[in-house]
Design a protein with these regions (language model features):
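Predominant activation on well-ordered alpha-helical scaffold segments within soluble catalytic domains
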Residues: 18, 48, 163-167, 182
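Mature extracellular/periplasmic domains of secretome proteins
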Residues: 42-63, 74-89, 99-112, 122-134
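An often Trp-containing, charged/polar helix-loop segment at the C-terminal end
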Residues: 175-196
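Subtilisin-like peptidase catalytic core
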Residues: 3-69, 187-192
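Extracellular S/T/G-rich loop segment that most often corresponds to the catalytic His/Ser-adjacent loop
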Residues: 100-171, 175, 179
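A cross-domain feature marking catalytic cores of carbohydrate-active enzymes
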Residues: 66, 93-95
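Gly/Ser-rich catalytic serine loop of serine hydrolases
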Residues: 3-15, 96, 150-162
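Structural detector of well-ordered beta-strand residues that form the stable sheet scaffold
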Residues: 31, 90-92
Length: 196
């Protein structure tokens, strides 16, 4: 499934995520794959085809600020995530904003991200099962459609923060595998228990 992308971002979500990545890793090369339509609607086949295309391109980092609750797509998403992992592509996916079973963030081959806020009552935290990393995702100023700026909240906005960090690390250490990159991030994350 390939669509003409001359319309660009139809809902602002991709623009917001790209603006966060660019703010953290300004020298990185960004590519966009549209899998969401107007009104944040999307389809499983579009998600699978977009991810399949991105994995085949061999990008160093793939940001997936989305998830699906459709179990029908879990097996193929898992295969694509594993394929990315073994070809040394770091796939970074946001946890669902609600405590529901969703994919692909739950797979071990994916770096999973939730939003972090100092408030203990953070609504967007997904405690069961816990995500691997938390990044800023609450009241974040982001780029928007037509060159605008808005403030928004969600795990989708935390995920590109981690993607930007991964891009910076890989720019300095391109030899790192996804496993090594995850390990490095664990050792340096301020929200990991036992950090010195």
């Amino acid at each position: 499934m390939v669509e003409d992308d001359s319309e660009g971002d139809l809902c602002g979500h991709g623009t917001a995520c790209a603006s966060i990545i660019r703010s953290i890793a300004p020298e990185c090369r960004l590519s966009s794959v549209r899998v969401l339509g107007a009104g944040f609607t999307g389809s499983g086949p579009a998600l699978l085809e977009g991810l399949r295309w991105a994995v085949a391109k061999g990008y160093d980092v793939i940001n997936l600020s989305l998830s699906t609750t459709k179990r029908d797509f879990a097996v193929v998403l898992h295969e694509l995530a594993d394929s990315a992992y073994f070809q040394r592509t770091m796939l970074i996916a946001s946890a669902h904003n609600m405590p529901v079973e969703s994919y692909p963030w739950r797979f071990a081959s994916v770096l999973s991200v939730g939003s972090h806020q100092q408030d203990a009552l953070d609504y967007f935290y997904n405690p069961t099962p816990p995500v691997e990393f938390f990044a800023r995702g609450v009241d974040v100023e982001v780029g928007w459609l037509d060159g605008g700026r808005i403030r928004s909240t969600g795990n989708s906005l935390a995920t590109p923060h981690m993607a930007g960090i991964c891009a910076l690390v890989l720019a300095k250490h391109p030899e790192l595998t996804p496993f090594q990159l995850k390990s490095l991030l664990y050792l340096t994350a301020s929200n990991v228990r036992g950090r010195r």
